Amino acid sequence: MPIPKSKKPSKQRKFLYNAPLHLRHKFMNAPLSKELREKYGVKRLPVRKGDTVKIVRGKFRGHEGTVAKVDLKKARIYVDGATIENSRGEQRFYPIHPSKVIITKLGEVDKVRQKIIERRKKEVK
């Protein structure tokens, strides 16, 4: 599915809402901390389960925790400790947009993630 070249905001939004899951990973980018940015030479990476993030905007600003779940359909992440009480009195995760967090520690850097880092490092130079 090609990315639309239209300037119309409505068509841009339509693409975001109807994008297939394999393209939604690109929407899950979050900036890296200064230390990680210097170490890897990359400004942003897609958030994954197991990454440690610091929330920089919203109700839970300043909270740091590990990513418990990544929801590609809703384009939200769920961080340990960022919970609210629902109407039944149970704790549930508060959905956070990935652009509102900073990755402070990468969980697992496997072959696929290393490939992404190498590819993006070339683009930055």
Swiss-Prot record:
Record's keyword annotation contains Ribosomal protein: yes
Keyword RNA-binding in record: yes
Keyword annotations: Ribonucleoprotein, Ribosomal protein, RNA-binding, rRNA-binding
Organism superkingdom: Archaea
Gene3D superfamilies xrefs: 2.30.30.30
GO cellular component: large ribosomal subunit
GO MF: rRNA binding; structural constituent of ribosome
Pfam families in alphabetical order: KOW, Ribosomal_L26
GO biological process, one term: translation
Subunit structure as annotated in this protein's UniProt entry: Part of the 50S ribosomal subunit.
Its biological purpose: One of two assembly initiator proteins, it binds directly to the 5'-end of the 23S rRNA, where it nucleates assembly of the 50S subunit.
Family the UniProt entry places it in: Belongs to the universal ribosomal protein uL24 family.
HAMAP family in UniProt: Ribosomal_uL24_A
Name of the protein in its database record: Large ribosomal subunit protein uL24
Organism: Ignicoccus hospitalis (strain KIN4/I / DSM 18386 / JCM 14125)
Upper lineage: Archaea, Thermoproteota, Thermoprotei, Desulfurococcales, Desulfurococcaceae
